From Swiss-Prot:
PROSITE patterns: ATP_P_PHORIBOSYLTR (PS01316). Pathway: Amino-acid biosynthesis; L-histidine biosynthesis; L-histidine from 5-phospho-alpha-D-ribose 1-diphosphate: step 1/9. This is ATP phosphoribosyltransferase. One of its GO terms (molecular function) is magnesium ion binding. Belongs to the ATP phosphoribosyltransferase family. Long subfamily. Keywords: Amino-acid biosynthesis, ATP-binding, Cytoplasm, Glycosyltransferase, Histidine biosynthesis, Magnesium, Metal-binding, Nucleotide-binding, Transferase. It comes from Actinobacillus pleuropneumoniae serotype 5b (strain L20). HAMAP family: HisG_Long. Catalyzes the condensation of ATP and 5-phosphoribose 1-diphosphate to form N'-(5'-phosphoribosyl)-ATP (PR-ATP). Has a crucial role in the pathway because the rate of histidine biosynthesis seems to be controlled primarily by regulation of HisG enzymatic activity. It catalyses: 1-(5-phospho-beta-D-ribosyl)-ATP + diphosphate = 5-phospho-alpha-D-ribose 1-diphosphate + ATP. The lineage of its organism: Bacteria, Pseudomonadati, Pseudomonadota, Gammaproteobacteria, Pasteurellales. One of its GO terms (cellular component) is cytoplasm. Its EC number is 2.4.2.17.
Length: 299
């Protein structure tokens, strides 16, 4: 277990999650002097220590209590869990929250010219993957017998190199598959980044710091999903407009100078289809509609 007085957090050193994790900490007000060559970094304004490691090492570091927190892709976390369960090893941790970045899917892909009729097409196929445990679980659920070929990188080249008949790999946009003459045919797992904590209780000071970080992370994510909306609204349409703009709390209503028929409305809304919403607001008689981004938010 970790004995340092600093809150120790494991992050991916390189790769798709690294920049997002760094940006999240920055948005949460954690000031860190990053040095690409150093594997340990320290916060300037909080008792926080960052360990920069390989992504597949993070679950084990949290399970064993070497670090207090870790940010990891759910796909890597569950792959490690399944492997440890198969070996009869103990798994203990707390999942604190799913984060709003690192989205991807684990998918089966085949040659783009091959006809696909369903998952039964993979019976007795050789499938190259870096996620053998997630693949095995999915295929067992579907009742499909197959042969797994473990590759830790460049999985997409396996079919053209004659190493496999198909692959099971992470997909974001699908551009890498297309570049290697493959097409996605089955999504077996959806993943995002998540924040996990070691199971053993933290000191009072460390837990208080974790709670502060969680509050800030929630504020950052809510701000990213929300907009601050200001508009002028007819008084007789307030009920309809309020229903159209679901807010975090009730809207603020202010009088307008020299206008007894309308009011100013301010609301923090999580409305997504906003061009359509603005058109509906205009139809209801709203005017001077302003939609502003929110940098930070504590609801």
């Amino acid at each position: 277990m970790t004995t340092t007085n600093r809150l120790r957090i494991a992050l991916q050193k390189k790769g798709r999650l690294s920049k997002d994790c760094n940006e999240l900490l920055k948005q949460c007000g954690v000031k860190i002097n990053w040095n690409e060559q150093r594997l340990i970094a320290y916060a300037e304004n909080m008792p926080i220590e960052i360990l920069r490691v390989r992504d597949d090492d993070i679950p084990g570091l949290v399970f064993e209590g070497v670090v207090d927190l870790g940010i990891i892709g759910e796909n890597v976390l569950e792959e490690e869990e399944l492997g440890r369960l198969a070996r009869g090893e103990k798994i203990e941790y707390k999942k604190l929250r799913t984060l709003d970045f690192g989205g991807c899917r684990l998918s089966l892909a085949i040659d783009r010219d091959r006809t696909y009729n369903g998952v039964q097409d993979f019976v007795n196929s050789r499938i190259a993957t870096s996620y053998p445990n997630l693949l095995k679980r999915y295929m067992n659920e579907k009742g499909v017998a197959f042969k797994s070929t473990l590759l830790n990188g460049s999985v997409e080249v396996a079919p053209s190199a004659g190493l496999a008949d198909a692959i099971c790999d992470l997909v974001s946009s699908g551009a890498t598959l297309e570049a290697n003459g493959l097409k996605e045919v089955e999504v077996i797992y959806q993943s995002k980044a998540c924040l996990i904590q070691r199971a053993e209780p933290l000191s009072t000071e460390k837990q208080a710091l974790v709670d502060r970080l969680l509050t800030r992370i929630q504020g950052v994510q809510q701000a990213a999903e929300s907009k601050y909306i200001m508009l002028h609204a007819p008084k007789d349409k307030l009920k309809e407009i309020t229903a159209l703009l679901p807010g975090v709390e009730n809207p603020t209503i202010l009088p307008l100078a020299n206008d007894s028929a309308r009011v100013a409305m301010h609301v923090v809304s999580q409305e997504n289809l906003f061009w359509e919403t603005m058109e509906q607001l205009k139809e209801m008689g709203a005017s001077s509609v302003l939609v502003l981004p929110i940098e930070k938010m504590l609801a």
